[in-house]
Regions:
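Long terminal segments
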Residues: 2-47, 53-55, 61-64, 70-72, ...
Length: 134
């Protein structure tokens, strides 16, 4: 479940209407795809979750696992704040400690600025969810 949530958050940053929506690891291996309807698939195209336009994040069985609010606040399924996504791509936990960064070019970095992945065709906010649901 932890791995699913991590990947789901990472994928959630994808734009639902982009044509090439993918998540890659630091070595550029594809680890996930996001379809135009918000379905999230792993590298083997198995459905692992869903992201809805309203910010609701669900697992493969449509159980809600979290929420991305319009102001960048991230909540778990129990509506507890687990973090914040800043407009500049800085990702913070609920205590405002920096967890990582999502750059405008799609590079995803940890708190020490090490590259941990790449996103293509995915909104920064959705990619940042990786830090909260892993």
């Amino acid at each position: 479940m932890r791995r699913f949530l991590t990947l789901l958050l990472f994928l959630a940053l994808s734009a639902v209407d982009a044509s090439a929506q993918m998540v890659q690891d630091a070595s550029y291996r594809i680890v996930a795809h996001i379809k135009s309807d918000g379905t999230i698939q792993d590298a083997s195209y198995r459905v692992i979750g869903h992201i809805n336009p309203n910010g609701t994040i669900q697992d493969a069985s449509y159980r809600t696992v979290g929420f991305l609010k319009r102001d960048g606040t991230v909540e778990d399924a129990s509506y507890r704040i687990v973090g914040h996504i800043k407009p500049d791509g800085v990702i913070q936990d609920s205590s405002y400690r920096i967890l990582g960064h999502v750059k405008t070019d799609g590079t995803v970095q940890d708190a020490s600025y090490r590259v941990i992945g790449h996103v293509k065709g995915i909104p920064m906010e959705w990619a940042a969810l990786y830090f909260f649901f892993r």
